[in-house]
Amino acid sequence: MKVEEKVKELLLPILEERDFKLVDIEFIPSKRPILRIYIYNPEGTSIDDCEWVSKRIGALLDVEDLIDKAYILEVSSPGLDRKFKNIEEYDIFKGRDVVVKTKEPINEKKVFKGTLLGLEDEKVKIKENEETVEIPFENVSQTKLDF
């Protein structure tokens, strides 16, 4: 089992305590490995939220000894300009404003801005100018939050 999968198993119960969502986990092996955890609080992810998660998961990681040498642990929000990396993010960020870019045009458009309604039947649904737009998931080249 990969480090990210083991960390996820340990992390999910911690996040559930405060209704936080796991956005992504990155493990970068090197002389001094880096473990990056991206979390989302629907009420706004604060530094205190990141610190709380860092202390809790850090203590568990030390007990479980998943990483066999000194490592850097980073816990943060996904950031303003981060592109969606996994399908779960379409549920995590439901209700938020997004920009969706397509590979092929839909009604002569390749960029859609609106409120994310979610992913249903392999289609990304957004509310754009009071109209629901359905974009086949395989046609999506990029999705990110719109600030």
UniProtKB/Swiss-Prot annotation:
Primary site of residence: cytoplasm
Q: Which InterPro entries match?
A: Ribosome_maturation_RimP, RimP_C, RimP_C_sf, RimP_N, RimP_N_sf
Give the UniProt entry's GO cellular component terms.
cytosol
Entry annotated with the keyword Cytoplasm: yes
Q: Which UniProt keywords apply?
A: Cytoplasm, Ribosome biogenesis
Give compartment(s).
Cytoplasm
Q: Does the keyword Heme apply?
A: no
Pfam families the record matches: DUF150_C, RimP_N
Q: Name one GO biological process term.
A: ribosomal small subunit assembly
Family indicated by similarity = Belongs to the RimP family.
> Which HAMAP family has this protein been placed in?
RimP
Against PANTHER family, the record matches this protein to: RIBOSOME MATURATION FACTOR RIMP
What task does this protein carry out? Required for maturation of 30S ribosomal subunits.
Mind telling me what this protein is named? Ribosome maturation factor RimP
Species: Sulfurihydrogenibium sp. (strain YO3AOP1)
